[in-house]
Amino acid sequence: MNRSTEQAQEQAVIKARCEADHLFFTRYFFKQRQQLRFRVNWHHHVIAGVVDDVIAGRRKDVVINVPPGSSKTELVAINVMARGLALNPYARFLHISYSDDLALLNSETAREIVQSDEYRALWPLEIADDAKSKKRWNVVVDGKKAGGVYAVSLGGQVTGFRAGHMAPGWQGAIIIDDPLKVEDAYSKTGRSKANRKLVSTVKSRKASPDTPIIVIMQRLAQDDPTGFIQSGGFPGAWECIEIPALIDDAYVSRLPEHVQGQVVRDAQDQDGRYSYWPYKEPLAELLALEATDRYVFSGQYQQRPSPLGGGIIKGD
């Protein structure tokens, strides 16, 4: 077997694995971009499994709550768009964040992956010549514009675009990464505005009732977008996945069996809690933060926000 045949076989294996496994895709293209290995923890398997379920149609509308610095944007915002177009170049994605700059940065990174030599060696897609904007860009199939991305802040205008298609199978998604700014979480007005926009902007931008929505965020208040969805403010059969920074054996026992064995049970506190990711978040540092600011820790880290005004801060 000559070298070119071996390379072709290697590429075929990589392509098949990328198309079948979201975490493999993320790790592969992270290394191509950063020249660094993506440091995998058990929670990445959980999140990637949810993404794979959404793409396969086994799940539709999902909220994932994670601590800061959990690689959520890499896994969900950036790579769902890039991999989603590999799986279906006609797929359409609406990407939303609280900040226009953040949404555009994620869109730009996804586009850079699609334009990379490594990606095009597996899926030879071109970016439309007039799609240089970070806000909106399309790939080209048979010389015509096909699928693509529209990126905008939650409060921004979305004109002439809907995510997904009225067709069976994987057609794209609405991906919402941090819909609420941390500072706005302390304001009832800010929280209410974000929740209103979530319904008015997002619901009308689905091309089909089957277009999935993925919301990924840290909890910021009881009536933040996650709480709003859980209370029925955004109709639908939503599923919520919580990944707290401090976990215990009871939490681990509820994880998928193939994930449970990947959890590192490192140092524990007196209540039997341990860090969800000791490599990045040592237990001592998490406990120090919990002791310093229980309000922030219970929400952003534990996904169990305390009431605003509960002896700490009152919203307007």
Swiss-Prot record:
Recorded superkingdom: Bacteria
InterPro entries the record matches: P-loop_NTPase
Name of the protein: Uncharacterized protein XF_1569/XF_1674
Source organism (scientific name): Xylella fastidiosa (strain 9a5c)
Species lineage: Bacteria, Pseudomonadati, Pseudomonadota, Gammaproteobacteria, Lysobacterales
